[in-house]
């Protein structure tokens, strides 16, 4: 079974300064560990809400670490310093708006302010980048919604084959 390389990028001014512990990045790692059977190698970084820092981290995770999947958390709201979607768009060759649409629809079941979220997803080379919200509960809800499409998307961009733990979640792959 191939090792899946996963980038986890937390964008947070306060967590990057050690003001509080980054629980969101850990939540992403926990959920993906439940969903995938492959050996996983996580490449984890916390950066301030600075566009150039986010862009550099995304590029490093995609180009240097050759991550199959890069998941960001934080910086997707309407606040002035929330710029993760802009950084993602800048480094991607293609955007995948359906991921953000589904995450907003899912989150609206729980909170009306989900309409303010700007989650997005895109492709850089052979890496799928997905922007998630910043709260662990919301991360789990959004990943549960979009994960069924992730393994097939990674197949299509020629990433490593993701073996799904079907006891915990289902994924969709068209019949060969």
Curated annotation (Swiss-Prot):
- Reactions listed under catalytic activity: molybdopterin + ATP + H(+) = adenylyl-molybdopterin + diphosphate
Q: Name one GO molecular function term.
A: ATP binding
Pathway listed for it is: Cofactor biosynthesis; molybdopterin biosynthesis
Question: Mind listing the GO biological process terms from this record?
Answer: Mo-molybdopterin cofactor biosynthetic process
Q: Which UniProt keywords apply?
A: ATP-binding, Molybdenum cofactor biosynthesis, Nucleotide-binding, Transferase
Q: Name the InterPro entries on file.
A: MoaB/Mog-like_dom_sf (IPR036425), MoaB/Mog_dom (IPR001453), MoCF_biosynth_CS (IPR008284), MPT_Adenylyltrnsfr/MoaC-Rel (IPR051920)
Q: Known Pfam families for this protein?
A: MoCF_biosynth (PF00994)
In the Enzyme Commission scheme, what number(s) does this protein have?
2.7.7.75
Output the CDD domains linked to this UniProt entry. Answer: MogA_MoaB
Is Transferase one of the keywords?
yes
Role description: Catalyzes the adenylation of molybdopterin as part of the biosynthesis of the molybdenum-cofactor.
What's the family? Belongs to the MoaB/Mog family.
Name under which the protein is recorded = Molybdopterin adenylyltransferase
The organism encoding this protein is: Helicobacter pylori (strain J99 / ATCC 700824) (Campylobacter pylori J99)
Q: Which lineage ranks, top first, belong to the organism behind this chain?
A: Bacteria, Pseudomonadati, Campylobacterota, Epsilonproteobacteria, Campylobacterales
